[in-house]
Amino acid sequence: MSSAPIGILGGTFDPIHYGHLAIAEEVRVALRLDRVLIIPAGEQPLKIGKHMAPPEHRLAMARLACADNPFFEVSSIEIDRPGPSYTHVTLQLLHDQGLENLYLILGADALADLPRWRETPRILTLARIVVVSRPGAAIDLPALAEMFPALPERLILIEGPRLDISSTDLRQRVAQGRPIRYQTPDAVVAYIEAHGLYR
């Protein structure tokens, strides 16, 4: 069993960008985490029906983006598992591997979606929730605490870096032939170009 504190940052990462990386680093330093697991989703339940780059490409881009940070580790735990990527299942699998001191990193928008997640009370027993607030994000904590009484004592709020970058915008820029350099690592830009993604 490992009591080392480990951050968990999941997402579609379609593509991963500097906003994701900055949030992971901000939380790692603020909470003195041993490392941060970057976990690309296989099939995200709340995004079923939306077109995504194939999982192997999203995983490869995440690995390229994280290659120069020894505290970031990219995991294929959700991509390797068939079916929807449910957070409570992923956290349980990590617990089963001996990782017991987990910090689930979310944006304020994802926190607002907690009522739509499966097994939210179970998630709160498996990990602390770290919310990185974004510019202008409003969090209705009283309403969430009413639904999930354990949330306030399991919640950590951190003000994150204000990088206004979105994967949706990057995909649109690529489709329009506009540059995405300086918004995602050069290795990711090169990978997108080499594989003709988002055209």
From Swiss-Prot:
Pfam families: CTP_transf_like (PF01467). One of its GO terms (molecular function) is ATP binding. Pathway: Cofactor biosynthesis; NAD(+) biosynthesis; deamido-NAD(+) from nicotinate D-ribonucleotide: step 1/1. Its EC number is 2.7.7.18. The keyword Secreted does not apply. One of its GO terms (biological process) is NAD biosynthetic process. It catalyses: nicotinate beta-D-ribonucleotide + ATP + H(+) = deamido-NAD(+) + diphosphate. Keywords: ATP-binding, NAD, Nucleotide-binding, Nucleotidyltransferase, Pyridine nucleotide biosynthesis, Transferase. PANTHER family: NICOTINATE-NUCLEOTIDE ADENYLYLTRANSFERASE-RELATED, PHOSPHOPANTETHEINE ADENYLYLTRANSFERASE. Belongs to the NadD family. Catalyzes the reversible adenylation of nicotinate mononucleotide (NaMN) to nicotinic acid adenine dinucleotide (NaAD). This is Probable nicotinate-nucleotide adenylyltransferase. It comes from Roseiflexus sp. (strain RS-1).
